[in-house]
C-alpha cells in the first residue's frame, strides 16, 4: 500500500485493527450543508474470521428495521463484502457516543426478536438465506465486548 486510494477503507491497514470496534470512517457534506457520518462497525477480525452469510443477512435486516425505532438520523446499514462488519451512516448526527448507544440498543432489540423482518421473496432478494439464531449470536457476541468498541487498534 504505497499510494492513497479513493476508498477510505482501502487506506486502512487491516492488519493493525482489532475487532470488535466502531470507528468513524468518513464524513461528507452535501450541497445544502447536510452532513453524513459513516461508521465502520467491525464485528470480526479482518482476514482471520468472518460472519456466515445467513447470519449476516438476517442481522442486516434486523438492524436496518430496528435501529429506526431509536433514531430518525439513520441513513443506511450496509454489510461489508468481506463479511467482517457493516457500514452505518447517519445524517446530521455527529455524536459518536450516541451512535454507540443506538447500536447497543438496536442489538439488544435483535436479541429479543422472534423473526427476521422482510424475510420473504417479495421483500428480500435472497429470502432463503437467513438465520435469526445466527444473527442473535452475532449481536450477543458484539454486545458482550462493548467495552472494546472505541479501541480500534487494540491499544
Curated annotation (Swiss-Prot):
> Domain of life, per the record?
Bacteria
Which is an annotated Pfam family here? Answer: LuxS
The free-text note explaining how the cofactor binds reads: Binds 1 Fe cation per subunit.
Q: Which cofactor does it need?
A: Fe cation
Q: What class of enzyme is it?
A: lyase
**UniProt subunit comment:** Homodimer.
Q: Which HAMAP family match?
A: LuxS
Q: Give the protein's recorded name.
A: S-ribosylhomocysteine lyase
What is the species of this protein? Listeria welshimeri serovar 6b (strain ATCC 35897 / DSM 20650 / CCUG 15529 / CIP 8149 / NCTC 11857 / SLCC 5334 / V8)
Query: What is the organism lineage in this UniProt record?
Result: Bacteria, Bacillati, Bacillota, Bacilli, Bacillales
